[in-house]
Amino acid sequence: MIEKVSSFLNEFKFEDIPKVAIDNSLRSFVDLIGVAASATQTDLSKIIRKHCKNFYAPNPNQGISSSIWFDGSNVNVLGATLANSMTIDSLDAHDGQKLTKGHVGCGLIPSIIACMEAEENYCSKDFLR
């Protein structure tokens, strides 16, 4: 089974994604960013952003950092992922509806963006893969 999944992932191309799936992904992404912007006003977001700025500083030897959204601060990849994910989750209005189980976009999207930002890789096709 794992061989089939691995083969599928290795052979899959961006061009194989149906337009409706891309459109839905982009709509969900915009929704998630809107939730993140609104959620910056929650107490949880303020606490976690302060925590990440204090304990997840970027490594000055590597020059690699990622941003805390709507804040202007840079931290390391883990700090950006943590701050942005928890900010989104603090409002609990993401992933389309409250009945959605798991809220996969809450952690996945901030993690992908933090990694892409740290690697200075801003390709939208890579983002959607």
Regions inferred by a protein language model and the residue ranges of each:
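N-terminal core-entry segment
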Residues: 1-129
